[in-house]
């Protein structure tokens, strides 16, 4: 199955961002992609660099204008399309939500980001409520979304640092792990620190694929986005979107600075082959992991 991840640079022009996303999705579909994933919050600039109540105006309902447009695009191109939105769930209640549109344009499912960061330049707790542990008719927040191309273990950005999230998706039968992302460097970081951060980000996601015997798709944004005048120094998003296999092998990788339609033909049967020789799920000591639900083992 041919998959595509979209690496895009954004501007303050919401309409232009969506037009550009659509053009890149069309490019991917023209090259035979059946599953296409956009980056985190692809409709706008990364507004979480500062805490500003006016930014809540960017939020929209699901279903809403963006899911309608993405659904029409998925139906026209006969693809499964993964988008990422600032969701207004109710008055005063907002989420960072990934959406999956089926080939017929219907909404196959949503995933509300579970782990919410609050770091300099990434003030997401101001805007986003964490996803519910259980939603969508009682399903766990870490439940794959069933589609015509497989069961998608869809997570979002900061979730990618947590092995528990990937494991729970795998235990629920995910065929692949997907991470729409918005991450980059602070301009004040020196080159050595930047390289350490990038290497850690790539390594941990590939490790989730290895530990669970699954392919991994990662879509990050690229380009420099200045902070608002009362904010910080801006963020240089580091791109490097990639696709890796169930042994962590690189299948495709973008560079840091270019808008990219990254494609690869993945074989979902390889997970069966890999899990036979590396039977991690078989050898888990489920009787010994109770303390994983503790905040800390005091």
Predicted regions and their residues:
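Short beta-strand segments enriched in small/hydrophobic residues
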Residues: 1-8
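Active-site beta-strand/loop signature of hydrolases that rely on acidic residues for catalysis
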Residues: 3, 17, 25-54, 74, ...
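Short, active-site-adjacent cap segments at secondary-structure transitions
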Residues: 43-46, 89, 224
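CN hydrolase (nitrilase-like) catalytic-core segments centered on the catalytic cysteine
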Residues: 59-82, 151, 157-260
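Active-site catalytic loop in hydrolytic enzyme cores
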Residues: 60, 72, 89-189, 193-203, ...
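Short beta-strand scaffold segments in enzyme catalytic cores
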Residues: 83-85, 97-100, 143, 241-243, ...
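A conserved C-terminal secondary-structure "cap"
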Residues: 271-298
